[in-house]
From Swiss-Prot:
Family: Belongs to the pseudouridine synthase TruD family.
Active-site residues (renumbered): 81 (nucleophile)
CC per GO annotation: cytosol
Name of the protein in question: tRNA pseudouridine synthase D
């Protein structure tokens, strides 16, 4: 499988070390944080699961069968990796207030555990989470000193907030299909495919812009015409506030953003517009898809700064712990640390 992200720039250059990632499911652990409390009553049974080596959609479908409902009656806040040990909530629409007997379901699938149940007055929807906690083990690391040096840099300034390769499908197939749909003006009622290809299109253009900022030495520097993310919202940067915004960036009070392309004009001006616009112009097929679906322009921070980053070395293995906001990719952190050695998985 080719790496669709291989052309994108690194914060501190391509890693020196190599390592195995997800050599075992336990080497990639994810714990979902919804960030809100359940009401304790309502039409929806909330089920917290821990799954090993299974994807979210499969577990949801099997849980639906166990509850005697249709697959559409089970929902989630976020899809979790198959090749991992992950904890997340699923909601099941059971308006009569019943709690099914899960014993047969659990006996059939030893890779799935039910950790807790609750009740809520609303179903879960994609995006109903504030973030995820990660425990990631890199095994058979070839140059631990370089990895730890890079981790210190990550702790200081973060990493490029790239969308991970999973956003683009196997071998970038989602991106290829997004271009084809835009080129051929494909129309469909399949909301899942439409959403998947639109996400791939916008994510790729964003990644290219972030990479260009790294290549041009302005990943950690505001330029004239930028759009900053502040605690109050988005703010235009120009000559009048450039120095002040740079000082605030150093204090992590504001962040630089890049385009999530839409059918309206970029809000950037001057130097920032000159940097971003070429990546819009060079993808006419992706932009045809985006414009045809009336996606509105949005912004995303270009730096991913993990919270509570720590690590522990045992021999030639290193285990990282950190938290990320929803929508960010742990693989974007790992990419800055090591070159991945492919693992033949039996799970």
């Amino acid at each position: 499988m080719s790496d669709i992200l291989s052309s994108l720039a690194y914060l501190t250059g391509k890693p020196v070390a190599s390592a195995k990632i997800k050599a075992q499911p336990e080497h990639f652990q994810v714990r979902e944080d919804l960030g809100f409390a359940f009401t304790g009553e309502g039409e929806h049974l909330m089920v917290r699961i821990r799954k090993t080596g299974e994807n979210t959609s499969f577990v949801a479908n099997e849980l639906a069968k166990a509850c005697g409902v249709k697959s559409k009656d089970v929902s989630w806040a976020g899809l979790k990796d198959r090749h991992a040990v992950t904890e997340q909530w699923l909601s099941v629409h059971l308006p009569k207030g019943e709690t099914p007997d899960f014993s047969t379901f659990l006996a059939q699938y030893p890779s799935i555990e039910i950790l807790a149940t609750d009740r809520h007055n609303k179903k879960l929807r994609p995006g109903d989470l504030i973030g995820n906690e990660f425990v990631v083990t890199l095994s058979e690391v070839t140059d631990m000193a370089d990895v730890e040096q890079r981790l210190e840099k990550v702790k200081q300034v973060g990493v490029p907030n790239y969308f991970g390769s999973q956003r683009f499908g196997n071998d970038g197939n989602n991106l290829d299909e997004a271009r084809r749909w835009g080129r051929e003006n494909v129309r469909t009622r399949n909301q899942n495919k439409r959403s998947m290809y639109l996400s791939a299109a916008r994510s790729w253009i964003f990644n290219r812009i972030v990479s260009a900022r790294l290549e041009n030495g302005v990943f950690d520097k505001f330029i004239d015409g930028d759009i900053a993310q502040t605690s109050q919202g988005l703010l235009a940067v120009d000559a009048s506030n450039l120095a002040d915004m740079q000082n605030k960036l150093a204090l992590s009070e504001v962040e630089i953003t890049a385009a999530l392309a839409g059918d309206n004009a970029l809000p950037t001006q001057a130097d920032a517009l000159a940097l971003e616009q070429p990546f819009i112009d060079e993808e006419p097929d992706l932009m045809a898809l985006i414009r045809g679906n009336r996606m509105r322009h949005d912004r995303r921070e270009i730096a991913l700064k993990p919270k509570d980053l720590a690590w522990n070395v045992e021999g030639n293995n290193i285990t990282l712990t950190f938290s990320l906001d929803a929508g960010s990719f742990a693989t974007s952190i790992v990419r800055e640390l090591v070159n991945e050695v492919k693992v033949e998985r039996e799970y």
